[in-house]
Amino acid sequence: VPPSVARALQYFRGLSREEKMQALVQYSKKLEAVPERFRNLDRADFAIPECQTQVDLYPDVRPDGTLHFYAAVDARRSPTIAAFLAILLGAVNDQPPATALGIPGDFARQMMDSIGLGAREAGLNAMLARVKRYAAQAAASAPTGSAPTGSAPPGGAPGQRAHS
């Protein structure tokens, strides 16, 4: 992990939840503006479609072989994403490609855990898994593929755990 990333992770681990939210806003303000030369390019080539937030990432290979990235993201609406990018890009900008390649694959998870949002992410995943499990059970038990309205969740009464 690049030293600046390690420092950021450690910094967030020592903050209260309110302080973390304030720090996210501060980090989000550190993103550089996207230079004019990138603004006229087709953003589809630089969009990150996997992200729910609209993010465009513009790479710039410098004459000395180092990399510099610019990110277009609405930091006001998505301070967590902007802060994550500011920390990540702060570590890899103006560095050789090996620095970016050395970022651990679980960096996002480490960041989310350090920021204190890992549990929220896990909770959202668990809720989605539960909804999908209920939907699959309902589809399997309903002859027409639709569950009757007003029925209890598949597997039991409301609040009970469905068995798979």
Per-region residue spans from a language model:
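Extended low-complexity intrinsically disordered regions
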Residues: 1-45
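Short beta-strand elements
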Residues: 53-61
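Glycine-rich phosphate/pyrophosphate-binding loops
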Residues: 94-110
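C-terminal binding/interaction regions
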Residues: 110-140, 161-163
